[in-house]
Structure formats: C-alpha cells, structure tokens
C-alpha cells in the first residue's frame, strides 16, 4: 500500500524511482577479483568487462568487453571468457596505434588507454586502461612501473586505482604506494602482488597506500 501511494504521489518518474529502489532494489556496479592481474567489472545494468583474463575462476558470465593490456600469457587468455554476441575485444594493439593512445565508447562505457611500461615491458606494446562505468572511474594499470601519465591522473578524480606490485616483473609495493599517492584515487587496490600466486594477503596488508582496499580472489565488492 505504501509503495502504491508513493507511485501515485510522485507520478511517472517517481514510479520509476520507486520501482527501482523499493521493488527491484538498488543495483550497483561491482568488481569481482579473480586473482593475479585478472578481474571483472559489472555495470549496474549488467554490462560485463573482463580485464587481463588469465587467473582464477569466474569467466562464465558472458562479457560485453574484454580488455588486454599486453600480450604476455598471464594477461591475454581471452578464450577463457564467455562472450555475448558482439563482444568487443580491445588489446594493446587496438588501444595504442602509431604512438596514439585511443579512447573507446562502447554503449556508454568509456575505455581510455594510457601508458604502461618498465624494464620488462616495452611502452610500445603495453597499455593501462581508465574505465568509466556508471560514472565510476577505475584505473587498471596493467604491468607497469611509475609512468609520466600518472602525474595527470589526480585531475581525473579517479574513484579506484588498481595497481600491480610484485616487485619482480613490475614495480614493488613501495613504488606502487608512491604511485597511489601521486594518482590520488579515492580508493586503491593492490593486485599482481606475488609472482606465480593468485594473491598474498600478508603483502597486501603491508602495502602503505592511502585508502587501501584489500580484495582477495573470488571476492566481489560494490563500487
């Protein structure tokens, strides 16, 4: 009765609001961590984005977009991902062309390619991504160390920075914390934290970054 009264009181747009928040529940974008450098983002409307598929489980949800930061085998196993018809695969090849970092708008999801590089990763063959979904800005660094681009990220007002920190193939935890402070995202998540392992919580807890959000494999959070 109360819901019906609110619908009548608020009119058409009010009815849409009531149906969404009182009847259907509030839908939110989510992030599911698979392990190593792999994770999945789902928008509030059900659009699914896989990032650097390789590790763990949870590839059975049909994807709309698959992002590959570079062509190392622990980041590019796109065959693992279930796909919706018309699923778009964007790898470093499409994202970085002739020295130009491209931006894609796919049904309202914006994918901006940015720099990624270190001594183990050629800057011409690697990218990171800034993903905007439901107005939430998420930086997925790929395999990298500190880059020149990062000095501009604070102005982007990122909601999440997802950073690597294994200290072997990529920057270590100390440099990753330095990057987190430079980027100034509202929340920071460390992944790709130990070579050959899905995750290491003890190392993640030692990460001295502001607003450190720890996510373990097979854990999902609301963004």
List each language-model region with its residue ranges:
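Core dinuclear metal-dependent hydrolase active-site scaffold
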Residues: 27-61, 65, 93-155, 171, ...
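Cap/insert and terminal regions of metallo-dependent hydrolase folds
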Residues: 147-223
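Short, Lys/Arg-enriched N-terminal segments with co-localized hydrophobic residues
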Residues: 4-27
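Histidine-centered active-site/metal-ligand motif
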Residues: 36, 70-75, 118-121, 192
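P-loop/Walker A phosphate-binding loop and immediately adjacent motor/lid segment at beta-alpha junctions
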Residues: 36, 78-99, 182-194, 212
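Di-metal (Zn2+ and/or Mg2+/Mn2+) metal-binding site signature of metallo-dependent hydrolases
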Residues: 55-94
């Amino acid at each position: 009765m109360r819901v019906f009264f609110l619908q009548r009181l608020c009119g058409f747009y009010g009815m849409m609001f009531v149906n969404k928040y009182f009847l259907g529940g509030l839908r939110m974008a989510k992030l599911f961590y698979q392990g190593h450098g792999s994770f999945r983002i789902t928008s509030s409307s059900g659009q699914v984005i896989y990032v650097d598929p390789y590790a763990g489980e949870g590839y059975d949800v049909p994807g709309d977009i698959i992002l590959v930061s570079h062509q190392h085998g622990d980041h590019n196993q796109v065959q693992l991902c279930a796909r919706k018809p018309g699923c778009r695969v964007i790898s470093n090849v499409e994202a970085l062309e002739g020295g130009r970092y491209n931006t894609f708008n796919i049904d309202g999801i914006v994918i901006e390619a940015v720099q990624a590089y270190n001594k183990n990763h050629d800057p011409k063959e690697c990218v990171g991504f800034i993903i905007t979904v439901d107005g939430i800005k998420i930086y997925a660094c790929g395999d990298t160390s500190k880059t020149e681009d990062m000095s501009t990220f604070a102005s982007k007002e990122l909601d999440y920075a997802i950073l690597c920190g294994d200290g072997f193939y990529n920057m270590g935890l100390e440099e990753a914390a330095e990057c987190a402070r430079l980027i100034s995202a509202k929340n920071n998540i460390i992944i790709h934290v130990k070579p050959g392992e899905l995750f290491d919580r003890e190392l993640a807890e030692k990460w001295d970054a502001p607003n450190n959000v720890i996510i373990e494999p097979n854990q999902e959070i609301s963004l």
